[in-house]
A protein has these predicted regions:
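Generic ordered-secondary-structure signal
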Residues: 8-16, 29, 37, 44, ...
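Extended aliphatic helical segments
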Residues: 7-12, 25, 36, 57, ...
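Catalytic cores of nucleic-acid endonucleases
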Residues: 56-59, 63-130
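Generic structural signal for short, flexible, solvent-exposed coil/loop and linker residues
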Residues: 31, 50, 97-99, 140
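Active-site or metal-binding loop neighborhoods of secreted/extracellular toxin and effector enzymes
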Residues: 99-206
Length: 206
């Protein structure tokens, strides 16, 4: 599963940079240090030039079981309770204009079940052009948007204004990328993925 998670991380990174989320979103893998110590696999740069909106998002990608996913969400809860956000120690921006640490970035999880991850990994390895329109693109965006909403509301209840504002701002940007509000029908559709379903249960119970 660890090997599959790594292949999925590489595949998702490649697809996002090939235009999965449009021209305004790019991702970069983190350093080995930040992967191991800070549990962050990718940094997403969302840069909507037309409206002067820019944000960095720390992404952890997991092909995992419910118990492990719960630990990821608990870590985010712990950061929010302390009104903290994620930190990446070693980072270079996509355009090369920035090198250094990134502080106070929202942490989110991308969850895909083992069966689905295997299909994506195989399609990526074979350079299957159908991957450009794979439903996982939409599933990931819904996961990220729903987490932003849940973590912002949780931060409100914890009195963590900085965290709440950061997650709300990120949700606003992700909704612009997605292009519409997320419907219950879409959530039900992607609920066939066991990890997507478990993620929904966890964030709805915060």
């Amino acid at each position: 599963t660890i090997k599959l998670a790594k292949v999925l991380e590489v595949a998702v990174n490649a697809q996002i940079n090939a235009g999965w989320f449009g021209p305004d979103v790019h991702t970069r893998p983190t350093s080995k240090y930040d992967d191991v110590e800070n549990k962050i696999d990718l940094i997403a740069e969302i840069d909507i030039h037309s409206q002067g909106l820019t944000a960095h998002v720390a992404l952890g990608i997991d092909v995992t079981y419910a118990q492990e996913l719960k630990g990821k969400i608990s870590r985010i809860q712990g950061e929010i309770i302390k009104n903290e956000l994620a930190t990446v120690k070693y980072y270079q921006s996509q355009d090369g204009h920035f090198t250094g640490s990134l502080n106070d970035i929202p942490r989110l999880v991308i969850g895909v079940d083992e069966e689905r991850a295997g299909i994506i990994a195989k399609a990526w390895y074979k350079k299957n052009p159908a991957l450009k329109k794979d439903p996982l693109r939409e599933q990931i965006l819904i996961e990220l948007i729903d987490q932003c909403e849940a973590f912002a509301n949780y931060a409100d209840r914890m009195g963590s204004a900085k965290a709440a504002a950061s997650y709300r701002r990120t949700k606003k940007l992700l909704l612009k990328v997605y292009g519409s509000e997320v419907t219950a029908q879409k959530r039900q559709e992607f609920g066939k993925d066991k990890v997507f379903r478990q993620l929904q249960i966890l964030i709805n119970s915060l």
